[in-house]
């Protein structure tokens, strides 16, 4: 019978899919100045690597991950943590080079897992389906003897039927089902998230590879794991998981739009947004406008620290000050 995902297109899910599609079109339409694409791709790759490895407990900060990408060895970091990060960079590059593959095979999955999990496996062998039974918290995945057959079914669905759905949905379904089967002895989480990105890439949803959706999962890991668990609790009904993932894509694309504006602004400034910048921009997006004192209280920074954050954002045309000098407020600039 094969794998047949079960879900309901609720009004909430439909609305989120439509919102994500509109945001994507806006971003794609702005991607006309190709000179800045490589810098944004590099920043996105670094963010995805940091987020996906951090979900699994890797302690390296975003700046330390960025240092490794640039060939520098971050201070106070252990060998395994560095290896996990280096592996994930290599895994994403493997995926990026294979976006045109029409049919995914078991060997493609084995090679991706071999790259991601090489030298960092706690049990089992990288690049081979597990031969042992495993337990993940309270969840007991299928027994080892069933893994190969279940993965044949998943690959058959991915290759033959995923294209019938929006990539927003098919990537989320692939992500969940891979984690549910848990085909490898270790390293399934990061492999599943890489596969979800692969689906967005090969379906042409993220043609420039500038969407760092893994940050959404990392920023609230308990909610991420809870959303996965709710599918099992509901008898494999994926509806709540799809609503969660589409909300994540919506937030991700809103952040990407801010980054695109930072690179594609009217000024010559090209700004790489740091987490603090994005926190400030999110505050302005949510509140509409904020006084200086409101900003530094919300950010828990000094007045000078807040001004230091604001200057590059204003220089890049992302933020502007309106009103009088004494009573002025900060707002997001209109696109």
Predicted regions and their residues:
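FIC/Doc superfamily catalytic core
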Residues: 1-335
């Amino acid at each position: 019978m094969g794998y047949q995902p079960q879900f309901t297109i609720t009004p909430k899910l439909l609305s989120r899919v439509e919102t994500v599609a509109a945001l994507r079109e806006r971003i794609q339409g702005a991607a006309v100045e190709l000179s800045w694409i490589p810098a944004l791709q590099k920043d996105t790759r670094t963010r995805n690597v940091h987020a996906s490895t951090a979900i699994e407990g890797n302690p390296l900060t975003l700046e330390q991950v960025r240092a490794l990408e640039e060939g520098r060895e971050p201070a106070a970091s252990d060998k395994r943590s560095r290896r996990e990060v280096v592996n994930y960079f290599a895994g994403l590059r493997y995926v990026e080079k294979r976006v045109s593959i029409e049919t995914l095979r078991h060997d493609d999955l084995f090679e991706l897992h071999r790259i991601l999990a090489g030298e960092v496996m706690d049990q089992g062998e990288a690049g081979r389906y597990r031969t042992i039974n495993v337990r993940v918290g309270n969840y007991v995945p299928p027994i080892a003897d069933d893994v190969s057959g279940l993965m044949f079914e998943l690959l058959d669905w991915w290759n033959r039927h995923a294209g019938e759905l929006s990539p927003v949905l098919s990537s989320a379904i692939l992500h969940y089902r891979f984690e549910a089967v848990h085909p490898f002895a270790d390293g399934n989480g990061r492999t599943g998230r890489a596969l979800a990105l692969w689906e967005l890439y090969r379906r042409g949803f993220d043609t420039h590879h500038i969407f760092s959706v893994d940050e959404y999962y990392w920023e609230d890991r308990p909610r991420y794991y809870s959303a996965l668990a709710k599918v099992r609790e509901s008898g494999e009904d994926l509806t709540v998981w799809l609503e969660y993932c589409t909300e994540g894509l919506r937030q991700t694309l809103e952040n990407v739009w801010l980054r695109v504006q930072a690179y594609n602004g009217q000024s010559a400034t090209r700004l790489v947004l740091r987490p603090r910048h994005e926190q400030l921009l999110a505050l302005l997006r949510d509140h509409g406008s904020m006084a200086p004192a409101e900003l530094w209280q919300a950010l828990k920074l000094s007045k000078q620290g807040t001004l230091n954050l604001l200057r590059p954002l204003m220089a890049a045309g992302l933020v502007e000050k309106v009103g009088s000098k004494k009573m002025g407020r900060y707002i997001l600039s209109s696109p």
